[in-house]
């Protein structure tokens, strides 16, 4: 009931919910051969482990849909082993380091997990995942195997790192490296898949996948900031000591010590972490501008717009120190609908960067730095899609920049997606108008 009342208090979000579930047409409906039991079971496992990821993966172009699904399940299996504290290190470390070799087999499974491990099914039925993996194009298999090797060894290194296990993340450099292993490598693998399928520009692989790495780091850092309280309850934290030590001697004190001074220090720390995360935004916008396939674009864009909206929610927000802070479900639906084209994504980023800037407090130690960073990002958004009305009368055309050719080359892609969007918008508006008129008629009939 509370969520329904929340939607009623935000009419645009209520409309977004209705439009998303009633009128949005997916680019590639997830149709599969009903007789392919093992492929079907893999998609069931995907839904069991993450319904949100399943929804976007199932709408991918058929060329990459199965490959991305298997990529996700393989990494989920790896993550399940790493997370399970009941597995002895003598078993876990070699298993993580050699997990990529299991992809050479066709019937490997694992039953040495703990009874409370929620995603253990992916290990019990890993042979079904292997069956579908071996049906993928060899190039796609190689990409999945390569990332599995890198991530498995990264996980093993962190388990053996006593300083990390005792004290957590030390420096910002360590913070970046940890996020790289957890999320940046996923971006690298996906980018290789996009480029190989000709769904993304080859320049996405340049500079050691720097832009793809930023995509992953932006998402992971946002989650780390948001999950402070939850991680604290689990006896861990990923906030880098180099940042939080400026504000407190003990990281737990942000939650435990309930004084105005400590709350201000905690919020100031949150804001510096947000500032750090914002350093990846321009790379993310660069990356998205170079993804050419509409379904792959949505797959990449949705998590990014959720992340920038979440950053705006956690910024300058003391609730992060004492509980879970999330964006509203209605906001999520609106962002999914509005992030289907590059102009839509740029508009969303600009919107939430302005929210962050307006939430800033002059008392914050990083007030000026945040203001400058927000200004830089807004200017970057303007560079991608300049405001023609803001041009001085003497200028007859927009000045060219590095985005001029990129935007021109993808204009037909975004326009074709926009043409698919418009009927859904129109039909939703017609239905809502009809419902509104009916309600008003009933009210008039009852009252008069």
From Swiss-Prot:
Q: What is its EC number?
A: 2.5.1.21
Instruction: Give the stretches traversing the membrane.
Output: 420-440
Q: Which domain of life is it from?
A: Eukaryota
**Keywords, ordered alphabetically:** Endoplasmic reticulum, Isoprene biosynthesis, Lipid biosynthesis, Lipid metabolism, Magnesium, Membrane, Microsome, Multifunctional enzyme, NADP, Steroid biosynthesis, Steroid metabolism, Sterol biosynthesis, Sterol metabolism, Transferase, Transmembrane, Transmembrane helix
Output one GO MF annotation.
squalene synthase [NAD(P)H] activity
What is the topology of this protein in the membrane according to its UniProt annotation? Single-pass membrane protein
What upregulates it? Expression is induced by lovastatin and fluconazole and is repressed by amphotericin B and caspofungin. Expression is repressed during spider biofilm formation.
Q: In which pathway does it act?
A: Terpene metabolism; lanosterol biosynthesis; lanosterol from farnesyl diphosphate: step 1/3
Q: Which cofactor does it need?
A: Mg(2+)
Q: Which GO terms describe its cellular component?
A: endoplasmic reticulum membrane
| Swiss-Prot/TrEMBL catalytic activity | 2 (2E,6E)-farnesyl diphosphate + NADPH + H(+) = squalene + 2 diphosphate + NADP(+); 2 (2E,6E)-farnesyl diphosphate + NADH + H(+) = squalene + 2 diphosphate + NAD(+)
- Whether Lipid metabolism counts among this entry's keywords is yes
Q: Which family does it belong to?
A: Belongs to the phytoene/squalene synthase family.
Which named protein is this? Squalene synthase ERG9
Q: Which organism is it from?
A: Candida albicans (Yeast)
Q: Which gene encodes it?
A: ERG9
